[in-house]
UniProtKB/Swiss-Prot annotation:
InterPro entries: AAA+_ATPase, ABC_transporter-like_ATP-bd, ABC_transporter-like_CS, Oligopep_ABC_C, P-loop_NTPase. Contains an N-terminal conserved nucleotide-binding domain and a C-terminal domain bound with a [4Fe-4S] cluster. The C-terminal domain forms a stable loop region and interacts with the N-terminal domain. Residues 5-255 form the ABC transporter domain. GO terms for cellular component: plasma membrane. [4Fe-4S] cluster binds at C285, C291, C298, C316. Signal peptide: none annotated. This is Dipeptide transport ATP-binding protein DppD. It is found in: Cell membrane. Its main location: membrane. GO terms for molecular function: 4 iron, 4 sulfur cluster binding; ATP binding; ATP hydrolysis activity; metal ion binding.
Amino acid sequence: MSIIIRVEDLRAVYLVREGTIKAADGISLDILENSVTAIVGESASGKSTIIEAMTKTLPPNGRILSGRVLYKGKDLLTMREEELRKIRWKEIALVPQAAQQSLNPTMKVIEHFKDTVEAHGVRWSHSELIEKASEKLRMVRLNPEAVLNSYPLQLSGGMKQRVLIALALLLDPVVLILDEPTSALDVLTQAHIIQLLKELKKMLKITLIFVTHDIAVAAELADKVAVIYGGNLVEYNSTFQIFKNPLHPYTRGLINSIMAVNADMSKVKPIPGDPPSLLNPPSGCRFHPRCEYAMEICKKEKPKWIRLDGEAHVACHLYEEGRPLK
């Protein structure tokens, strides 16, 4: 598979009263065409910042300090807004986090579709809009006749999430980015959304990128996994290899903390300690205060991003020292 998006040394921060939050600190990542890539990490690890920076949709206090995001050889970060508007939704679409808050409660669903079309300079007649919107709603297993004239408050959380996905698909993008698509949903609805995304991927042959704090969701849906910790990318590999042979101590900790329905509680091992403050992150490797394998060098120097066999990449001093995780 060829590379459809290349992220190079992406650094993004938030300016707050207390100081500067270093939310994405030197992220480099290749997204392969027609792949499903999960960006996984704990809450407040910088996952959402990465995709917001990639799409230049950071909030007003967000700043991109450096880096490149290459799409078809062009850097999205240096494009003017009018250039970006030609790409957003038509080629790269973003489904925001929190379906409950992402739809305007005073507007019917059909009005959201109309606004999306107008915002991106597409000229459709009313009948064309209804036809296209209905087609996308059916794709996400919603009844257009029932949904188009409904207000968001008349829809369940799962229905709102599917409406957002339908809106994102309206202009037939080739890349679909989803921020926590299963958060704030009950377990059954989560399963339905995951299955829906699998079907859409197969049907439309698009590239999916999604953010999640739940590595079990990544196991269900993704074929590539990028693991984020404290604003740093610490591991990237195929999903199969991530679960078969996790390279980074943090990745292993995430996997060991998964609790199955029939889990032996004595074998479930939560990661000790708390995630770092990105206002004042630890020196060296940001995971070292919680890592059972930490060495003196981990406290002083940030580990290099190393490519190992095949697709495997890891940022860990164990591999620089020739002492891989066992």
